[in-house]
Structures are given as C-alpha cells and as structure tokens.
Amino acid sequence: MANGIYKITEDFEKSLSDYTGAPYVVTVDNQSNALFLALMFENVKGKEITIPARTYPSVPCEIIHAGAKIKFAPVEGKTLKGAYQLAPTNVWDSALCFTADMYKPGTHMCVSFTGPYKHFKLSKGGAILTDNLEAYHWFKRARYSGRRECSYHDDNFDMLGWNFYMMPELAARGLLLMNQFYNLDGTKKYNADLELPYPDLSKFEIYKQ
C-alpha cells in the first residue's frame, strides 16, 4: 500500500485497471521501459523474439538490452496498427492500442501515454497491464530502484532495480484525464486502434546483434 505523495500513483493505477480490465497495473516513466521490465521478468536472455519489421525503434532496443535477439517479421505496407505480441513471450506492445476492457488474460500489455498521436495524451508515461501477482510485485520494486513502498531509511535492500517510476504529478494529471474515457452515463468509451507509419527496421545492422 502506497502512502504520502505516491498514493496518487496507486489511485491512477487503480483507475487504469478499472478501465482496461487488467487485474493489476504498474505505471512507469515511459512505455519503452515498460517493455524492458516485462522482458526482464520473463527472462528472455539468449532467446529469439519476433516483432514486426515496422515498429517504433525503441522496441528492438529494449529487446537487445534485455539480452535477447531479434527476428523481424515482414509487414505489408508501411504502417503498423494496434497491439502485437513480442513472440513467443507473453509481452505485448500496446502503444497503438488503448481502449476499454482491452486486457488480454495471461499477458503483460505495455501501453503508452507519450506523444501527440496516442489516445491518452499524458505527454509522457506508460504502464504494464498484467494478471500475474508475482510480476505485479516485481514490477513495482523494479521500477523504483528495488525499493519497497516505505522510507529508504526503513527498507531492507535486497534487489537491484531501475529508476523508472512515474512522477506523482504526472499520475495526478492522468487521474484527472481519465474522465475523457467515460460517457456521461458512466459507461466506458471504446477507442479504435491507431495506425502509424514506421521505417523498416530490418534494414539496419544495429538491430542484428
């Protein structure tokens, strides 16, 4: 249970859970780091992961940072639409998908609130949607330098983490903006998947490590 200024982050996560249908939600500073944490939890080091050849460049970066290798799948046309699996893992890149009841059971769905094209224009930020309680607790500590939700004067440090947490003021803004995804009668609004053009990343040697 969060306390102090970080309680607002927990409230925002609860609102995302209610809207998306995910049992657990962990917010982070951006969606690229959400993908990285999900891949690290799934221990993908040394494995081959297949992604669309046309996607945002940070996706192959995070796969490589997590210790895996990339296999690019051909894409018809020059655009990418909606969410896709980082196969064969249960990690999904959902940067182009944010809608009511979107959560797919058994997955870690990584959503994005960054940039002018997203449905949720929070300027910055991302989240991991999951139904895995063990992963939920790991993500919460991993994003916060391995810390538990207490003062670092009282913590027992036994985990190496990263500084990926969402700033409380951004979570507060997100909580206020959640109203846009509900109708006046309280029912949820559904958003169409986004479709955006991306370069063919399979042409670049840097991703073939």
Regions found by a protein language model. Name each.
Residues 33, 57-58, 134:
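Short alpha-helical
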Residues 1-10, 179-182:
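A glycine-/small-polar-enriched, mobile loop at the entrance of the PLP active site in fold-type I
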Residues 10-49, 62-66:
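Phosphate-binding glycine-rich loop
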Residues 98-100, 104, 108-209:
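Active-site region of PLP-dependent enzymes
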Residues 39-101:
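PLP-dependent aminotransferase-like
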Residues 2-3, 19-20, 119-123:
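Short glycine-enriched loop/turn motifs at secondary-structure junctions
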Residues 27, 72-74, 110-112:
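Structural signal for conserved beta-strand scaffold positions within catalytic alpha/beta enzyme cores
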